[in-house]
Design a protein with these regions (language model features):
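N-terminal transmembrane-helix/juxtamembrane module of multi-pass inner/ER membrane proteins
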Residues: 1-39, 70-95
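Membrane-embedded catalytic cores of phosphoryl/pyrophosphoryl-handling enzymes
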Residues: 28, 43-44, 57, 82-158
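Polybasic, low-complexity association/targeting segments
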Residues: 38-62
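Alpha-helical transmembrane segments
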Residues: 1, 62-67, 126-130
Length: 158
């Protein structure tokens, strides 16, 4: 029988945080920052102005759809984030946890970019980035494993 506590309990957070170190903290904070909206907006602007206007517009639509879907899902499920004692960052954050917006947007944005570029090395790079952004959210204690997996799943659908 599957134990739902694996997805929405603190076991995954505790397992990752058992390796806590200032270096890992900094590394995972950097990966989380790569999943912030302002990074995506900057990349979209650079793409639009420097490379390909059509791709920049498409990227905007893809991310906008993902953001609306994430908001709707968070409001629908209304699930809390992990307790603040597990959080390395955002200790006072009261936003909803499921699904992880960082994981969802990473899958949506980097997955779309990988499909557009169609190069093996970019696909590997983008998949690794998606994985590390999701993992960072668990390590930093701001999401449960289930939040991140839900974000990845909803990212695939947006």
């Amino acid at each position: 029988m599957f134990d739902v506590d694996i997805l929405f309990g603190t076991e995954a957070i505790e397992a990752l945080q058992s390796a806590l170190s200032p270096t890992l903290d900094l590394l995972f904070i950097l990966f989380t920052l790569l999943g912030e909206d302002y990074i995506y907006m900057s990349l979209i602007a650079i793409t639009y102005w420097c490379f390909n206007k059509r791709a920049g517009v498409q990227m905007s639509y893809v991310l906008l759809i993902s953001a609306y879907l994430n908001y709707w899902l968070k409001m629908s499920f209304n699930m809390d984030k992990p307790p603040s004692e597990y959080r390395i960052i955002l200790k006072d954050d009261i936003s909803h946890g499921f699904p992880s917006g960082h994981a969802q947007n990473a899958v949506t944005f980097w997955g779309w970019a990988g499909l557009k570029l169609r190069k093996a090395w970019t696909s590997i790079l983008f998949f690794t980035l998606i994985f590390l952004i999701g993992l960072s959210r668990i390590y930093l204690g701001v999401h449960y494993l289930g939040d991140v997996l839900g974000g990845c799943s909803s990212g695939l659908s947006s």
